[in-house]
A protein has these predicted regions:
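Beta-strand-rich domains and repeat architectures in extracellular enzymes and scaffolds
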Residues: 26-49
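Conserved beta-strand positions in repeat-built beta-propeller and related beta-rich domains
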Residues: 38, 46-49, 86-91, 132-136, ...
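Short coil/turn segments that connect the beta-strands within blades of beta-propeller domains
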Residues: 41-42, 82-83, 127-128, 174-175, ...
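WD40 beta-propeller blade core
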Residues: 54, 96, 141, 187-188, ...
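Blade-level signature of beta-propeller repeat domains, shared across WD40, Kelch, NHL, RCC1
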Residues: 245-267
Length: 267
């Protein structure tokens, strides 16, 4: 609770004026403003209107396409490691890994390895295991594919609001695991699955990470939150735009709304 209150106080008191201006470049159609990702080299991954996976270069130009061979809805993309890109199909309970050329490396059906829950969200860990959020049993699990078993199981029944939880995203970043709950905020765990606290930013559809900051779109602003000092800064976004999420590169900012992404240059 102390962590939660400290973060809330810092966020309220440390607002800084925006330091950068945005210059519009171009737009692209897409199918989802939340099924998005960015790798450590600055490439962006989105789903086109036909739900094919597109990789865009740092300027927002299409580089590669992956057309899934079978039907299914890609619900999560994790591409931070461009050598091993994760696609999670919630409806099929399947995790697909792609290489740097967007070619399949492996496919794992969670039901084939006796995973008894219903995974709502999935992401990669630094040791090439999978983090899974089990919606049925309200558990954070770590799946080791080499052992074909769970190596971490953290019950969340005393942490989550049973009546209102709505987990949208998970991400391991700098040896911590961040779980985004739309209604309650961001839950933070260490890389052993131990609960460390929460960050009370509610109503978020997606969170991104850049250096030591977490960022998100809310109330017409792109908000940045320092993971270590709890300071925050914000950038006013163009008026009249219903932006939902963002991906921030070194020179480009990708702002996502329903049906398209607008690409801007930082200045």
């Amino acid at each position: 609770m102390a962590l939660c209150l400290a973060h809330e106080k810092a966020f309220a008191q440390q607002e800084e004026p925006p330091l950068q201006q945005l210059v519009y470049s171009h737009s692209m159609p897409l199918s989802s403003p939340t099924t998005i990702s960015q790798d450590r080299n600055g490439s962006i991954y989105v789903l086109d209107p036909l739900r094919n996976l597109l990789r865009l270069d740092s300027l927002g130009r299409p580089l590669d396409t992956f057309s899934p061979p079978t039907r299914g809805r890609i619900s999560h993309i994790e591409a931070w490691n461009p050598m091993k890109i994760l696609l999670f199909y919630e409806d099929r309970q399947e995790v697909l890994l792609l290489d740097r050329f967007l070619r399949p490396i492996s496919s794992t059906d969670l039901r084939d390895i006796n995973y008894e829950g219903m995974a709502k969200a999935a992401t990669l860990s630094a040791d090439d295991s999978f983090w899974l959020f089990d919606e049925t049993n309200q558990t954070l699990s770590k799946l080791d594919l080499r052992l074909r078993q769970l190596t971490v199981e953290t019950p969340l029944n005393l942490i989550l609001d049973k009546a209102r939880f709505d987990v949208r995203q998970m991400r391991e970043y700098q040896n911590m695991v961040y779980m985004l709950d739309y209604n309650s905020g961001i839950y933070v765990f260490d890389n052993l699955g131990n609960y460390k606290g929460s960050i009370p930013f509610k109503g978020l559809a997606y969170i991104g990470f850049r250096e030591n900051e977490l960022y998100f779109v809310q109330d017409g602003k792109l908000n940045f939150y320092d993971l270590y000092t709890q300071q925050q800064r914000s950038l006013e976004l163009p008026e009249g735009k219903a932006y939902i999420t963002a991906l921030a590169g070194d020179k480009q900012l990708y702002l996502f709304s329903k049906g398209k992404v607008d690409i801007y240059t930082w200045q």
